[in-house]
Regions:
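Short Pro-Cys-Gly-centered "Cys-loop" motif that presents a nucleophilic cysteine in a tight turn
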Residues: 1-82, 96-338
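Short beta-strand->loop micro-motif that forms the acidic, two-metal-ion catalytic signature
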Residues: 89-97
Length: 338
């Protein structure tokens, strides 16, 4: 949350007492801006875009993001208990040895993802708002509440009925390496699948993420079922989420699901703002534009001039139930109200 601070200018011509008060006030302000942190205490980290716009338009967006996060987490030796990318923001429940290590992880992963994102979306400049939001969770109850809150983001935004049924909470991967597809038996698979698995393992073993160009090439010759299998394989291979650490707060996976289903969790330390009744509107807009415009890639739409984006804005306003602000967020378009 941004705070409005009133600054009093005190000079050496003022009384010594007033000058001393000014110095104390400055110190208090600077301390208040320092990130609250405690070693190996779980932190809820939150990111949104600088312009409030959408981040994720396709499954490839989520996969690029996920593999970058996991590769960076291994290098920075942070422990992730939960994470959930939402269409226009991201959540992490994460432990780190120091505040600088946490900041380094967020910086490194964000920088790499922004490079990939900007390239595919034909844009320049920063993507995420800075600094990222974070709030430490000092008690077991606070940790449980936060984990539930992160996992329940998709149901709360009506993307799914149950958290574990939504691939991008990664909850289902706690008990299965292929929760959304048939088990992949590589030796019995078609050559394009075998080739894809080999290239993915080469990237993974080298500590590298999966870039857009590689993923687009690997997915292009696959059937719908094979794409689901490969997605499960990628997530299970790269996954760094410490499910055992998370389960300690719930005793078992069954108890975890019971807690997630019975309460939404809460977050009082980080202020989130939501637009519209459901985030399903964003995927609906993707389907409409793919049908109406038939672009080679949905991201190409983001490179259109503002005038053409405004024409799409009018189209989407006519064909969807999305709010004006949601359509503007989707197109990264500034819409003036009369």
């Amino acid at each position: 949350m941004r705070q409005k601070i009133t600054i009093f200018v005190v000079t050496d011509q003022d009384s010594p007492a007033l000058l001393k008060c000014g110095i104390v006030l400055y110190i208090l302000i600077m301390k208040s801006r320092k990130r609250s942190f405690q070693k190996n205490v779980l932190n809820h980290c939150y990111q949104r875009t600088a312009d409030g716009g959408v981040i994720f338009y396709s499954n490839l967006d989520y996969l690029v993001w996920f593999t970058i996060v996991c590769a960076t987490a291994r290098k920075r030796k942070v422990r992730i208990l939960a994470m959930c990318p939402m269409p226009d923001h991201t959540h992490f429940s994460i432990e780190a040895a120091s505040s600088s290590e946490l900041a380094a992880f967020m910086r490194d992963y964000s920088s790499l993802f922004v490079l990939e994102h900007n390239k595919i979306c034909h844009r320049k400049g920063p993507l995420f708002d800075t600094p990222f939001g974070s709030a430490p969770k000092y008690s077991d109850k606070m940790v449980r509440t936060n984990l539930i809150y992160v996992w329940n983001n998709p149901p709360e935004r009506k993307l799914i009925g149950k958290s574990e049924d939504y691939r991008w909470t990664f909850l289902a991967y706690a008990v299965s390496d292929h929760p959304f597809s048939k088990k992949l038996v590589v030796r019995n698979s078609r050559w394009p699948v075998q080739k894809a698995v080999k290239e993915i393992m080469t990237q993974f073993n080298a500590g590298r993420h999966l870039p857009y160009a590689l993923l687009k090439r690997l997915y292009e010759p696959l059937t719908a079922d094979e794409k689901q299998q490969l997605t499960d394989f990628i997530i299970s291979t790269y996954n760094v989420i410490d499910y055992n650490a998370a389960l300690k707060y719930f005793n078992s996976y069954e108890d975890l699901l019971l807690a997630v289903h019975s309460t939404t969790g809460s977050e009082h330390d980080i202020k989130e703002s939501f637009v519209g009744k459901t985030d399903k509107d964003y995927s609906a807009m993707v389907r409409i534009l793919l049908r109406e415009l038939q672009p080679k890639d949905i991201h190409d739409i983001l490179a259109l001039p503002q005038e053409e984006k405004y024409e799409l804005f009018l189209l989407l306003r006519r064909l969807t139930y999305a709010k004006t602000e949601q359509i503007a967020k989707f197109l990264h378009l500034a819409v003036k109200r009369n």
